[in-house]
């Protein structure tokens, strides 16, 4: 409770709590290369959102999970590009002092990564559903040759593919969240969610852009925001090949 009071007190007032979980070449690793030894934190994290504005950073390390301030001595922030244009950073920790009461008791990198992937999956499912709704409304009201685009068989078939991907992504996300909340093993479902998001969400976003025609490329129109979000989430999770390797590893170990 003392840790909750300390680190979460400002959230209700708008303070940002960000997470530094991924490392160069390793998306959400359960065995981070970042070390926490003798009260000193060392390592590099990438794809850390809003690190500069955050009040605290949740950092996964080899021996636990620690909360540090981005302004602490030994913390260096390097801004990196993102598809959405949002604030994203690489964060380097060099002998950063980690107080004993800043180490989250009972927390592990594996558990934090489970919760992070579940949240990312739910966010992505919402983004795909939003793009589907936006596209369906557009083709229903945009006319060509005297009839709505949605009445053309090819358009309807392409939109159906987007619908299938959207519903299966939502199903995978809901399954993961239910299993985690019920205290059940969710590792297999999480691997499927990660792969389905990274392999299916980007192509259906391309389809939505295609169905919008030139309107989809207009930055004053919201379609590009959905696609940019999915591109960033796919990169955060390591891409489809990386995620497929994790699914294969689970299959070979069972």
Predicted regions and their residues:
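FAD-binding glycine-rich core of flavoenzymes that anchor FAD
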Residues: 1-18
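A generic structural signal for well-ordered coil/turn residues at beta-strand boundaries
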Residues: 13-15, 30-32, 52-55, 62, ...
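A short, Trp-centered hydrophobic/proline-enriched beta-strand micro-motif
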Residues: 13-26, 59
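Alpha-helical interface subdomain recognition
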Residues: 14, 40, 114-254
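Cytochrome P450 C-terminal beta-domain/meander region
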Residues: 28-42
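Flexible, small-/acidic-enriched active-site or ligand-binding loops
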Residues: 31, 47-48, 70-108
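A short core secondary-structure module
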Residues: 44-76
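Residue-level signal for inorganic ion chemistry
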Residues: 59, 66, 91, 128, ...
């Amino acid at each position: 409770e003392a840790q909750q009071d300390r680190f979460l007190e400002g959230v209700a007032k708008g303070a940002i709590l960000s997470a530094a979980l991924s490392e160069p070449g390793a998306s959400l690793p359960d065995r981070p290369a970042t070390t926490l030894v003798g009260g000193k934190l060392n390592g590099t994290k990438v794809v850390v959102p809003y690190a500069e504005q955050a009040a605290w950073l949740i950092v996964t390390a080899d021996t636990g999970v620690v909360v540090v301030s981005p302004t602490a001595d030994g913390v260096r922030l390097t801004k990196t590009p993102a598809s959405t244009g949002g604030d994203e950073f690489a964060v380097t920790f060099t002998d950063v002092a980690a107080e004993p009461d800043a180490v989250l008791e009972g927390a592990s990198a594996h558990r934090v990564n489970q919760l992070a992937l579940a949240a990312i999956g739910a966010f992505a499912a919402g983004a795909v559903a939003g793009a589907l709704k936006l596209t369906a409304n557009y083709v229903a009201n945009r006319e060509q040759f005297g009839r709505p685009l949605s009445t053309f068989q090819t358009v309807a078939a392409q939109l159906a593919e987007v619908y299938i991907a959207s519903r299966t992504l939502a199903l995978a996300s809901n399954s993961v969240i239910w299993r985690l909340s019920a205290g059940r093993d969710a590792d297999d479902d999480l691997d499927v969610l990660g792969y389905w998001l990274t392999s299916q969400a980007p192509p259906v976003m391309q389809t939505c852009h295609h169905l919008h025609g030139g309107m989809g490329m207009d930055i004053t129109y919201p379609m590009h925001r959905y696609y940019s979000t999915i591109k960033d989430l796919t990169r955060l999770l390591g891409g489809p090949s990386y995620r497929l390797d994790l699914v294969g590893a689970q299959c070979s170990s069972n």
